[in-house]
């Protein structure tokens, strides 16, 4: 098996399979260099071109990290890469400023497209333990679909006093209740609130 590949190409192929299997998306070229011990990205690109030419992978040059691992005979393997979107990680939220303003974005994180249901999705780091009963802990990352409205029971990111907070949303008779999922904390009652988006996912570092 792999008689037509050199040692580095085999290492790259195995590394990409492992990363896609574990994470759901392929590594970057720089990550490939570090994992295999290559000194330059141009060398890695050369090996990737050979792997593509020999039918082991398929690439889309118009998209970042767009690589599919193919089995021999050009049949798709279980390691097929789904399209990846680089989702912005928002570091701060300021009243009167678009949430995705360049100055608000600290970094980006690649997520499979089926995990992201809107181009205006962003990621926010959770501060505090007000949502622990919903499995959302301090320093978790919440995936947020940007929208200005919410239904009762939605977990939302709301702007209060120039600060973003994650709570469950309830519109009641004469106020809005932002309910924490922590029995030791009281709800926040307000006449009106700015909704920045609805939480659609959560992940954390272990």
Curated annotation (Swiss-Prot):
Site (Cleavage): 95-96
Pfam families linked: LexA_DNA_bind, Peptidase_S24
GO biological process, one term: negative regulation of DNA-templated transcription
Enzyme class per UniProt: hydrolase
Reaction(s) catalysed (UniProt annotation): Hydrolysis of Ala-|-Gly bond in repressor LexA
DNA-binding region, residue intervals: 29-49
Entry annotated with the keyword Cell membrane: no
Active site annotation, chain numbering: 130, 167
Domain of life: Bacteria
Keywords recorded for this protein, A-Z: Autocatalytic cleavage, DNA damage, DNA repair, DNA replication, DNA-binding, Hydrolase, Repressor, SOS response, Transcription, Transcription regulation
GO MF annotations, alphabetized: DNA binding; serine-type endopeptidase activity
Family: Belongs to the peptidase S24 family.
Annotated PANTHER family: LEXA REPRESSOR (PTHR33516), LEXA REPRESSOR-RELATED (PTHR33516:SF2)
Subunit structure: Homodimer.
Function of the protein: Represses a number of genes involved in the response to DNA damage (SOS response), including recA and lexA. In the presence of single-stranded DNA, RecA interacts with LexA causing an autocatalytic cleavage which disrupts the DNA-binding part of LexA, leading to derepression of the SOS regulon and eventually DNA repair.
Protein name: LexA repressor
């Amino acid at each position: 098996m792999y008689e037509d590949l050199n040692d580095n190409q085999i290492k790259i192929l195995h590394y990409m399979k492992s990363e896609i299997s574990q994470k759901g998306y392929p590594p970057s070229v720089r990550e490939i260099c570090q994992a295999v011990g290559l000194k330059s990205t141009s060398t890695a690109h050369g090996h990737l071109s050979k792997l593509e030419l020999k039918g082991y992978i398929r690439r889309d040059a118009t998209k970042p990290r767009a690589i599919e691992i193919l089995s021999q005979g050009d049949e798709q393997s279980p390691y097929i890469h789904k399209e990846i979107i680089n989702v912005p990680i928002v570091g701060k939220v300021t009243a009167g400023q678009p949430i995705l303003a360049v100055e608000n974005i600290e970094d980006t994180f690649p997520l499979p497209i089926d995990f992201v249901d809107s181009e205006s999705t962003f990621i926010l780091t959770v501060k505090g333990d007000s949502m622990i009963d919903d499995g959302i802990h301090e320093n978790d990352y919440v995936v947020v679909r940007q929208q200005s409205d919410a239904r009762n029971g939605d977990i939302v990111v709301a702007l209060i006093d120039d600060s973003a907070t994650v709570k469950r949303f309830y519109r009641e008779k004469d106020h809005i209740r932002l309910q924490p999922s922590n029995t030791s904390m009281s709800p926040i009652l307000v006449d009106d609130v700015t909704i920045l988006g609805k939480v659609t996912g959560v992940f954390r570092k272990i």
